Amino acid sequence: MKNQYVPVITLDGPSASGKGTIARLVSQALGFHYLDSGALYRLVALAAMKRGVDAGDEQGVVGIARSLDVSFADSSIRLDGIDVSDEIRAEACGEYASKIAQYSALRVELLERQRDLRKLPGLVADGRDMGSVIFPDATLKIYLTANEEERARRRHKQLMEKGINASIAHLVLALRERDERDSKRVASPLQQCEDTRLLDTTGLNIDQVVGKVLGMYADSGSIE
């Protein structure tokens, strides 16, 4: 495994479980690099949508990924030199990304891009297969989850802050459908591995969850 001596914390879990926010804050607390794997798939989705490639066109989508010009710097995510940090968070982009994430060829194409981000002093990576596929030798693997209602409320809050209206009932159904699609896909399905620690964040605030993750990392014996 490339750079196997560099510590890695993986946070996997379903959509709206809070893994992105928690991973970013944990990386800041430890001074580690941060990998938002979902952003890579959303970037492919956005690029494909802009070029009129249908989500059902696997070869077309993989071709887009192969020539993807992206950069992560200064808290911004850039596609072809343009900041698309907000654009990739749109629901339509997320739905497209969820559909194309089932393609084995696409996951292979993005595999090394993700592993190349494993650099000193360490990495915190969030996604759905970070601990099971991308970094199976991670120092600490956590499966982050929350009940459907809590996740729907979090997603609703995110959308409202962006001026996007959505009903919680609709979001519950959308999350349920996405969970089923993510867990049943053939390529790297969403699952909790045997060596992954479960962290249910239902009823917990952000600081509490970050504290628990940092505590787990300290307990792993990786902090000297």
Swiss-Prot record:
Cell compartments where the protein resides: Cytoplasm
Q: Which SUPFAM superfamilies match?
A: P-loop containing nucleoside triphosphate hydrolases
Primary site of residence: cytoplasm
Q: Please give the family membership noted in the entry.
A: Belongs to the cytidylate kinase family. Type 1 subfamily.
One Pfam family linked to the record: Cytidylate_kin
Question: What's the catalysed reaction?
Answer: CMP + ATP = CDP + ADP; dCMP + ATP = dCDP + ADP
Q: Where does ATP bind?
A: G13, P14, S15, A16, S17, G18, K19, G20, T21
Please list the GO biological process terms of this entry: pyrimidine nucleotide metabolic process
**Segments traversing the membrane:** none
What keywords does the record list, in alphabetical order? ATP-binding, Cytoplasm, Kinase, Nucleotide-binding, Transferase
Task: Return the InterPro entries for the record.
Answer: Cytidylate_kin, Cytidylate_kinase_dom, P-loop_NTPase
Protein source organism: Nitrosomonas eutropha (strain DSM 101675 / C91 / Nm57)
A GO MF annotation of the entry reads: dCMP kinase activity
EC id:
2.7.4.25
Can you name this protein?
Answer: Cytidylate kinase
Its Gene Ontology cellular component terms are:
cytoplasm
